[in-house]
């Protein structure tokens, strides 16, 4: 039986972003996989050493080698080239769970990426304000945009 209890409140977090990219949907989807995996980095350009196993149940994690790292989530759904969905704690070392979705559609040579990150749990205030979370996802989507356009023009 606990000797003391602290009041804990369950909070939510939501980030939604839309990106329109002048590149075919297949190229954009492949670029998302690369940017979520081996090319993932902080907004300051530091590698996050991420691995993404692109199949249902595949892991998404930071690989520090020698059997060390940080589990971020599992691939909940993957339907190339239109959907990537991941669930797990992501970057939070707190009792929380996240769902991240990339939904892609293509029309007239433009791929539209609808991004959504939703989380629920004991999320600390420094994450709930959304500043750093928005900065991180915004940076990743910018890298996806730039890399997909470069790839398409090559």
Report each predicted region and the residues it spans.
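Residue-level preference for beta-strand/loop junctions
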Residues: 11-13, 56, 67, 96
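Hydrophobic ligand-binding cavity/cleft-lining segments
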Residues: 1-47
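A solvent-exposed, acidic/Ser-Thr-rich amphipathic alpha-helical stretch
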Residues: 25, 45-58, 71
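Hydrophobic pocket/interface hotspot
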Residues: 28-32, 60, 75, 86, ...
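A structural signal for short, well-ordered beta-strand segments
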Residues: 17-19, 102, 115-117
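A conserved amphipathic terminal alpha-helix motif
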Residues: 119-154
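Hydrophobic-ligand binding "helix-grip"
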Residues: 50-51, 61, 65-109, 118-121, ...
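Short, contiguous alpha-helical
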Residues: 33-37, 44-45, 107, 112, ...
């Amino acid at each position: 039986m606990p000797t003391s209890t602290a009041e804990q409140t369950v909070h939510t977090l939501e980030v939604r972003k839309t990106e329109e990219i002048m590149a075919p949907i297949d190229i954009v989807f492949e670029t998302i996989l690369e940017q979520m995996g081996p090319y993932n980095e902080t907004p300051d350009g530091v590698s996050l050493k991420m691995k993404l196993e692109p199949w249902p149940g595949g892991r998404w994690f930071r690989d520090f080698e020698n059997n060390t790292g940080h589990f971020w989530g599992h691939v909940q759904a993957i339907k190339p080239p239109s959907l990537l969905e991941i669930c797990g704690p992501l970057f939070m070392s707190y009792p929380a769970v996240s769902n991240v979705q990339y939904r892609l559609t293509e029309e007239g040579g433009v791929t539209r990426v609808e991004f959504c990150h939703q989380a629920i749990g004991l999320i600390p205030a420094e994450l709930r304000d959304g500043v750093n979370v928005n900065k991180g996802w915004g940076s990743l989507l910018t890298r996806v945009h730039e890399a997909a356009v470069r790839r398409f023009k090559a």
